[in-house]
Amino acid sequence: MKTLSIEPLTRAAFAPFGDVIETQGAKQIPINLGTTMRFHDLAKIDVADEGGRPLVNLFRGQPRTLPFEVTMLERHPLGSQAFVPLTDRPYIVVVAPAGDLDASKIRAFVTSGWQGVNYAKGVWHHPLIALGEVSDFIVVDRGGDGRNLNEQNLPESLWLTDDALLAVGA
């Protein structure tokens, strides 16, 4: 069984794949007569290719149990895809760089709970891996014509395990 190591989600580690959406380290702008803090420009939403438009959706992820077998990844070649959790439950993100899928470059991250992610256009990723309970996410992605989904099976399964999750203190 080939196990994926799991890393804590940080902006620096995730930068090759897109953006981490979080308030920590974000530019803050007080608005509305100082009664609201705006955390500004948290992700680069990129959905305009081939006349695309932004969609705002709610995804309800069923919890996955570990060990969890990763057998495939998907990508959206025409637009980014942002996931913003509506709870503070950690979830796992599995990604690989854009371009031809190279299974040796697959990485896994665990969020702190409130962190969101924005997958850059063309980045390979696994569908939502919620942990513990049913979890809701606001998802901003692309609507419009054109084929914006590719799925690819991995040459061999990779596993996410409790031990790998515990190794990062999650």
From Swiss-Prot:
The processes (GO biological process) annotated in the record are: allantoin catabolic process; purine nucleobase catabolic process
EC class: lyase
Q: Which cofactor does it need?
A: Ni(2+)
Is Lyase one of the keywords?
yes
Pfam families reported for this sequence: Ureidogly_lyase
InterPro entries, alphabetized: RmlC_Cupin_sf (IPR011051), UAH_cupin (IPR047233), Ureidogly_lyase (IPR007247), Ureidogly_lyase_bac (IPR023525), Ureidoglycolate_lyase_dom_sf (IPR024060)
Instruction: Please give the function described in this protein's UniProt entry.
Output: Catalyzes the catabolism of the allantoin degradation intermediate (S)-ureidoglycolate, generating urea and glyoxylate. Involved in the utilization of allantoin as nitrogen source.
The protein depicted here goes by the name: Ureidoglycolate lyase
